[in-house]
Amino acid sequence: MLILTRRVGETLMIGDEVTVTVLGVKGNQVRIGVNAPKDVSVHREEIYMRIQAEKGNVTPGNY
């Protein structure tokens, strides 16, 4: 796992087309913005896991 430190307003790149920007920090919550092409799905982990479970692709702890 790559661990990075970013300040509010700073961005990191994933490949050539995906950017992740720190929008704000409030207490223990971080707001981030993700800019990705329309053909790249972006989900919170819990939503992704629900989608995979509905497809029958994932069992708990197996992703």
UniProtKB/Swiss-Prot annotation:
The keyword Iron does not apply. One of its GO terms (molecular function) is mRNA 5'-UTR binding. One of its GO terms (biological process) is positive regulation of translational initiation. Pfam families: CsrA. SUPFAM superfamilies: CsrA-like. One of its GO terms (cellular component) is cytosol. Gene3D superfamilies: Translational regulator CsrA (2.60.40.4380). It is found in: Cytoplasm. Keywords: Activator, Cytoplasm, Repressor, RNA-binding, Translation regulation. The keyword RNA-binding applies. PANTHER family: CARBON STORAGE REGULATOR (PTHR34984:SF1). Homodimer; the beta-strands of each monomer intercalate to form a hydrophobic core, while the alpha-helices form wings that extend away from the core. Belongs to the CsrA/RsmA family. A key translational regulator that binds mRNA to regulate translation initiation and/or mRNA stability. Mediates global changes in gene expression, shifting from rapid growth to stress survival by linking envelope stress, the stringent response and the catabolite repression systems. Usually binds in the 5'-UTR; binding at or near the Shine-Dalgarno sequence prevents ribosome-binding, repressing translation, binding elsewhere in the 5'-UTR can activate translation and/or stabilize the mRNA. Its function is antagonized by small RNA(s). This is Translational regulator CsrA. It comes from Vibrio vulnificus (strain YJ016).
